[in-house]
Regions:
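Small-residue helix/turn framework positions
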Residues: 55-81, 101-130, 164-166, 171, ...
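A short, amphipathic edge element
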Residues: 43-50, 259, 455
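Intrinsically disordered, low-complexity linkers and terminal tails enriched in Pro/Gly
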Residues: 129-158, 353-354
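N-terminal type II signal-anchor transmembrane helix
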Residues: 1-44, 566
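An amphipathic, basic-hydrophobic helix/alpha-beta surface used to engage anionic
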Residues: 85
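N-terminal helix-cap/turn-to-beta initiation motif at the start of protein domains
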Residues: 153-164, 417
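Gram-negative outer-membrane assembly/targeting C-terminal domains
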Residues: 542-567
């Protein structure tokens, strides 16, 4: 072996021996108080961990049983726990000067508890607040920081800087106080923040598995950390979500009846108060009601808007809902429902009964939206009709034609009021024979439509609430029956109650005798004033009768004239 090779080998052996021997002469646990102080001061929370050991080769201290205290206003249990954390340190000052210079953190499989209270505040909001006003995590710190935030002054930021903070394979449980149901759990959470400093903007990456198998990936920048409220830290990010089930994820109450699977691609910019977003959403298996079947076709949504976090309010500048070639546009505003003095929700404003900002019910937004669409192909909208459990008689379907609508959607999300005009042109109701549903005097008229009813025109103003549907100013042109005018209601239990007047003089489904009979039974005025019709039953099984009350009290001359005068 050559001389230089021997020297190199000896050097390597010596270095390895020294590295292996250092932990024998350096008690890593002596650095625990210094690290405790640094982390507790930086986070404004009590930070503790168990046994420490030095790993020279990875240039880190390996800590067992990490625990970070929660904000005592939320929970006495820890905010974060982990079996092991690797704390990167600079070895030279550590070994020779016993000085702890932190470089990075790698936390393995932590358990993190994220909690939101009724006002929308988060338990991580107080992270980073200075402990000068009290012990880390004490009420004094929280009260002082909250006071500073309300006065518009910025809390001082910790001088804590590291190259890397990494969370690997974590588990995050989201819950609310007061508690309602089980926590929503996100598994396999991975977070990376590079060049981290409280006072600077830094890049980060986040990924996790969502409940029911979906995934989320976020890349962007955070910072500087807001010293009074970490939840108000400015951020810019690109968010990609695959296979989101919002019911399983806890965003939608199962009792609302809405369910779907969605893929999202969203860009957001948050200045600490307002978030400006735009993006696209691809929706499959959409259900708008509990008793509905899933939409057979996907629905695509493109939107842009703003959201004010503290007030939990925002504006939808434009959202385009696309089903095939049909496009429906939505715009408007929303805000949180404020509780009344009795504790029940009130839509007055975004302040509570006591005037405290943020004392709002975040689960019940109040909407003020406009929904419009012009000349929408009815064939494309069949998918949405399925998702909304729209029932047509005897399982029939609309074929061809277009629909236009201009609706206003207002009120709390759980008790919306939808009003406005709807217009339908040149469609066919396939699979329903009107003539088989007409009873009483009308059945004598000889109406024959077959299993397809043509609807040339339909105009109606609707008002839809939880109590049912009110339809006013109905005007329809159905060639088999003539022109129809009137109004009616559909109850919350799907009971029909419509009163229409049919001008039958031009009805193609009636013979001349039928037209004359209608007219005669109505006192000779059927061709001009029309024949009253009553529709009851359900959308599945409508029952149509001629309203002949009082007809037989009229003169019998029109009836006798129908069959000719006395010879």
């Amino acid at each position: 072996m050559k001389r230089w090779a021997k020297i190199l080998l000896i050097v390597i052996v010596v270095v390895v021996a020294i590295a292996a021997a250092v932990p024998l002469f350096v008690d890593a646990n002596t650095f625990r108080p210094a690290i405790d102080r640094q982390l507790s001061r930086a986070l404004g929370r009590s930070v503790t961990f168990g046994d420490l050991r030095l790993s020279v080769f990875s240039r880190s201290l390996v800590a067992k049983d990490l625990s970070v205290a929660d904000d005592p206003n939320f929970s006495a249990a820890p905010f974060l726990t982990a079996k092991e954390v690797r704390i990167g340190v600079s070895l030279r000052p550590l070994i020779f000067s016993h000085e702890v210079v932190l470089r990075d953190f790698e936390i393995e499989s932590p358990q993190i508890a994220v909690i939101r209270d009724a006002s929308g505040a988060w338990n991580f909001s107080s992270i980073g607040r200075r402990a000068a006003a009290g012990a880390p995590g004490s009420g004094g710190v929280a009260e002082k920081a909250a006071s500073e935030a309300s006065q518009g002054s910025a809390a001082p930021l910790p001088d804590f800087v590291v190259d890397l903070i990494a969370v690997e394979d974590g588990r995050v449980a989201f819950s609310t106080v007061p508690g309602r149901g089980q926590a929503i759990v996100y598994d396999h959470v991975n977070v990376t923040a590079r060049d981290f400093a409280f006072a600077l903007r830094f890049p980060f990456d986040f990924s996790a598995d969502l409940p029911a198998g979906g995934t989320i990936n976020v890349s962007g920048h955070l910072g500087p950390i807001n010293g009074g409220d970490a939840a108000a830290t400015p951020a810019e990010a690109q968010i990609t979500v695959k296979g989101l089930d919002p019911v399983a994820a806890g965003f939608i109450d199962p009792e609302d009846g809405l369910s779907l699977l969605a893929d999202l691609n969203v860009h957001t910019a948050f200045d600490g108060q307002t978030s400006t977003t735009n993006g696209t959403v691809h929706i499959e298996h959409l259900k708008l009601r509990k008793d509905a079947a899933a939409a057979p076709k996907p629905v695509d949504l493109a939107y842009r808007g703003t959201h004010r976090v503290r007030e939990y309010s925002g504006q939808i500048d434009d959202a385009t809902i696309k089903v095939g070639d049909a496009e429906i546009h939505v715009s408007g505003t929303y805000h949180a429902m404020a509780p009344s003095a009795s504790g029940a929700p009130s839509a007055a404003n975004a302040k509570g009964a006591t005037g405290t900002p943020g004392a709002v019910s975040l689960e019940v937004p109040v909407l003020n939206l406009k929904l419009s669409g012009q000349n929408l192909p009815i064939d494309e909208l069949q998918s949405l009709m399925t998702a909304a459990a729209v029932r047509l008689p005897n399982g029939s379907k609309l074929k061809g034609g277009v629909v236009s609508l201009n609706l206003v959607v207002t009120g709390p999300a759980k008790s919306l009021v939808i009003t406005g005009p709807i217009a339908v042109d040149n469609t066919r109701l396939v699979g329903f024979d009107i003539s088989n549903k007409i009873h009483g005097i009308a059945s004598l008229s000889g109406v024959k439509t077959g299993d397809t009813s043509e609807i040339q025109k339909l105009r109606v103003n609707v008002r839809v609430t939880n109590g049912g549907v009110v339809a006013n100013d109905i005007y329809a042109v159905i060639p088999a029956m003539g022109e129809l005018n009137g109004s009616g209601t559909i109850s919350a239990t799907n009971q029909l109650d419509f009163n229409l007047v049919a001008k039958v003089s031009s009805a193609s489904g009636l013979g001349k005798v039928g037209v004359d009979l209608f007219s005669a039974l109505n006192g000779g005025s059927g061709k001009k004033s029309g024949v009253p019709l009553r529709i009851t039953g359900t959308p599945d099984e409508p029952y149509i009768t001629a309203d002949v009350g009082g007809v037989f009290q009229k003169t019998t001359n029109p009836i006798t004239s129908l069959f000719g005068k006395k010879k």
